[in-house]
Amino acid sequence: MKETVGNKIVLIGAGDVGVAYAYALINQGMADHLAIIDIDEKKLEGNVMDLNHGVVWADSRTRVTKGTYADCEDAAMVVICAGAAQKPGETRLQLVDKNVKIMKSIVGDVMASGFDGIFLVASNPVDILTYAVWKFSGLEWNRVIGSGTVLDSARFRYMLGELYEVAPSSVHAYIIGEHGDTELPVLSSATIAGVSLSRMLDKDPELEGRLEKIFEDTRDAAYHIIDAKGSTSYGIGMGLARITRAILQNQDVAVPVSALLHGEYGEEDIYIGTPAVVNRRGIRRVVELEITDHEMERFKHSANTLREIQKQFF
């Protein structure tokens, strides 16, 4: 497995998610050069100007430019945020047909440049579109990563932190499966400030109802946000920046992403949300969590849901 070289990033798609990611990236000073590609040239020009004016106050300088696909040739990463937007009431899986075609076009142009880095995909439905990018690119599986359940896990940790009045950084809990309606919480391995959530459940049976409500709020958060403001952006932008940092700083840190399975959880040939160790090679390894029989049953349902959609296109 080869390491990606340099800190240049090409961002494809400067909508709400893409710009939020670019803003987070600049504030964290991770890229030397951020080239942005978007079909709306006028709006892109305004975003590039606006971001560059903010770079003045960042801790380190990021050169932000209007990009072309030729910029991908020497990029360490290509981050895809482009695609048809999710409409109010529309599930992520309903976006498949439109966005698979968009991915095929984008990936063809990227690979024609000679790109040899890492793809990070955020377009929805992210698990299936990450699989599409892998198939269309011909790259090794570990160099194609989806944002997966990074945002869902963050939402879950935040809400658990609110319940127990601790910082989210002291909450260790994962959402796995599809980034969408069939995802599931892994309560069996979750800890709050080092205390097992399973142990808390044993002591307080009524806690189960509160946790189920928190999970439902986590799962449905995107629908509420989209209904209120049209799209999700800041949370996923920060999540993408976290994955980017893990890659470019070669951190070998476990992050909940969409990764290709090779027998983990008894599944293969699908991209799905699970913790994975990430570094400059992309995904070093998938982390297979020890989950209960009930959690496994729900995970299998999630995997089958994705597979049924995926097989219509691949």
UniProtKB/Swiss-Prot annotation:
Substrate binds at residues 86, 92, 124-127, 152-155, 232. It is an enzyme of class 1 (oxidoreductase). Beta-D-fructose 1,6-bisphosphate binds at residues 157, 172. Pfam families: Ldh_1_C, Ldh_1_N. GO terms for biological process: glycolytic process; lactate metabolic process. NAD(+) binds at residues 17, 38, 43, 69, 83-84, 105, 122-124, 147. The keyword Protein biosynthesis does not apply. Disulfide bonds: none annotated. GO terms for cellular component: cytoplasm. The keyword Cytoplasm applies. One of its GO terms (molecular function) is L-lactate dehydrogenase activity. It catalyses: (S)-lactate + NAD(+) = pyruvate + NADH + H(+). The modification Phosphotyrosine is found at residue 223. Keywords: Allosteric enzyme, Cytoplasm, NAD, Oxidoreductase, Phosphoprotein. Pathway: Fermentation; pyruvate fermentation to lactate; (S)-lactate from pyruvate: step 1/1. InterPro entries: L-lactate/malate_DH, L-lactate_DH, L-lactate_DH_AS, Lactate/malate_DH_C, Lactate/malate_DH_N, Lactate_DH/Glyco_Ohase_4_C, NAD(P)-bd_dom_sf. NCBIfam families: L-LDH-NAD, PRK00066.1. Catalyzes the conversion of lactate to pyruvate. Homotetramer. This is L-lactate dehydrogenase. The lineage of its organism: Bacteria, Bacillati, Actinomycetota, Actinomycetes, Mycobacteriales.
